[in-house]
Amino acid sequence: MLAHLAFQTLVLVVDGSVVGRGCVALMLHVVYKGRALPVAWLVRSGKQGHCPADLHLALVEQVHDLLPAGARVVLLGDGEFDGTRLQAAIQGYHWSDVVRTGRHGTVTWDGEHFRCETIGACIKPGTLVALREAHVTRDAYGPVLLLCCWAKDYHEPLYLLTHMADADEACRLYAKRLRIETFFSDQKSRGFHLHRSHVSDPVRLSRLLIAAC
């Protein structure tokens, strides 16, 4: 399937969710015809929360090895996936990415140092601000394109990091990240209720996901 879809840009979405009893599944999906289709996952013991960066890297590497050489890829992720190690790995694969980052994130741009929320405090709903050649975190990782997107009818702006050149395209693609939330709802409250399974072994849960997906 991936080889067939790779004739066009592959939009991948990564996220984690509680499964079974005391386990979390980190999953990577491909967006196809409005749905998020699971491609690969890793299950670990642990409570709901951010997975270790090493697990992020392992999953992305696993999917990279499945793709045909030269595939055009955009990876989407929420604030869990704004780590610089993951961004560097994605760059090494020659993929594009659009990931959310927190409002308290440190930014260096045009010789100035400030937090992401400083941008949001200066704009109104319906505004998109793009800071090119920005560096983020205290380690000044970059350059990246930092976006502050405040959609109309929303209470606060969204802060995104990307290596894409087109700010509007990056925002449009990031909206597809929500497709993975629909998948998790289908597997939980509207479907297999994986979060209520009493299975606590990561290996068994990984196999169960094969059947559920």
Task: Locate predicted features.
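Single, function-defining residue in the core of a domain
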Residues: 5-10, 21-23, 32-213
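Aromatic- and Gly/Pro-rich donor/ligand-binding loops
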Residues: 13
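Nucleic-acid-interacting cores, centered on viral/eukaryotic replication and modification enzymes
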Residues: 29
